[in-house]
Amino acid sequence: MKPAQKCNTLTKANRKKLVTRSTLGVALVALAVTALVVDPVVLIAKYQLRVTPGTEMYRMLTSEIEGAYVSAYLFNISNAEAFLSGADSRLRVHEVGPFTYQEKRYNTHFEVDEKAQVLRYRPFINVTFMPEMSVAEPADVNVTVGNTALLAIATAMSSHPFWSQLALNLLTRRYKSRAVVTLPVHDLLWGHHEPLLAFGHKLMPGWINFEQLGLLDRLYDNTREYQLELSLEDQTKFQVRRVNGHAGLTAWSYNDPNKRSRCNTFVDAYEGFSYPAGLTPERPIRLYRNVFCRMLEVDFSGTKTLDYGPELYVYKLSNRTFTKNPDTECLCSAIGCKDGLSDLSPCFYSLPVMMSNAHFYGAPAEVYARIDGIAPDEQKHGGVFAIDQKLGSALQTSMTFQLNVPVADVTYNKEARSFANITVPIAYFKVTQPEVPDHVKTLFWLVYVLGPYAVYAVAAGLAAAGLGLLATAACLLSTPMPLTKQAIARVQVHCELPLIKHAHKQTLLSDRARQYDRGETGVRE
């Protein structure tokens, strides 16, 4: 026997309110929890960092970018005549600088390949002199430095037969090349006439394609275009995939499949302006710039927070960068490896030029044992990089690199013999990232400072509204129906009448049962 139907005292309007308020209340509470877990402000920021038209990142990469400051310091030789004559056995130097320039960079042939998930472009860099950040105008200051061309060529010829060395000696006398030159800083950086180079350019234009030698002029050689291909996949965003179509450094034997290794491939290599979002301390990172002719190894060092909000991961240039180890062994194929130094010759027209930290920081003391005036200091000459760990933006950079000529046994050459077996420092460059613009600071402040409070406030409001709606829905279930004629009639129709019908049905069934019982009794009698 079925039980009597329960009496529903809710009106049709109240039932609709109950469903609406319950559904909306649950949705608002769920939305509040989602806002706290997902952090929508960071999601919006990541959206703007996509490389698609209309985003901030796309605008930046397709516009002229005010890049890093590059400060040049020259190693002025203070005892040139005494050292060349043999009166002094030690080379004395002191740094002159800074002469600061700012990079202006724009990317040509810009292409976003969404199907392959890569970004392609050709970086083009010009520099502008910054007098307010310099000690003087470069053209107004003379310095005395080692003649890079003569010392490098003499070193290159030191392993050649006697007749080749004799030819160089004859050319040195004919063109009156000196192992030490005194030049304006501007000429040293941007080009000065060196007779040996001019002769080499005429004799072998395919090898030496320039007549004047300038340190920055060679480093910012825009005549040698190269194309970068970067990943756009979330986990490897902005990682270098290819340079000029190659997935490794062709200068360091990448084209030989038997010599490929982490050393000459772009594994974990980035150009340095941005990285994948959500970095972890365990994630390996290397830096690649064409001018370095290699990857720079960096190590996680710690964290810090900027006053406008970002939480930064701090990395330092690793000692592994300038020591012989599995990550650098491919770099030892040309003129060999020396601790504290890195060979640049494959990218410097095969001339023996080596890179180091400024003042040979991190190199063993024997590298500069015959040089006075070298004072390595981690604070001044080390490399530090700070990256926003949530969004992957590089916000602080400071590093140095020094150009040196590792002079071999050049006693066969009268002009260069005083420098035999000395690694001669020519100049070093300090690269620093400019302070981020105010509008970028404001964006980070919104993401890291105001954003979280706004999310908490909105989440609290959503949760309160949702719980309030659920509470009013619960009240609808327990609120008595108002005693109006319509309500009473409804109760009578929907509640009392079914009960009366049910009671009447029960009475009829009981009567029939009693009649049945009497009938059975009569039969037995």
Spans of model-derived segments:
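A positional/structural detector of protein chain ends, strongest at the extreme C-terminus
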Residues: M1-P3, G522-E525
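Extracellular or lumenal secretory-pathway regions
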Residues: K2-L306, P310-E311, S318-S393, S398-D517
